[in-house]
């Protein structure tokens, strides 16, 4: 954790193939001697630090495992927590975790609809060079357009995978 930035910086080397951080939250608990509480309060600062380091160098980041694979509600809550913090997914240890994890980390219909509205609004000729516009009465900046495109891309990728099965 102390060297998260330096490790993430390796991704800038074209000879390197670092694309993603995968967190070992059990290892983090062991080494820090923190208590494994449901809200992960004790390790949130370290999770946030690794997320910031990963993002600074364009890396994805996958949250650590949830040990009680029979506790779907607890697992779902931890997935929600990870997604809220900015994680891209979660390490899984049991087939029963696949469905809930996919549900949490897949953009909702509402998120996709909002993203499409933002994309459509900025694609209008009158808005093509604006930095800030209004969509449904809300201020939206170009940074929201970047976020909307990412959400739309994830939703599209999930649909393509679903079409395979």
Where in the sequence are the language-model features?
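Expand to "…catalyze enediolate/carbanion chemistry for C-C bond making/breaking, isomerization
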Residues: 1-165
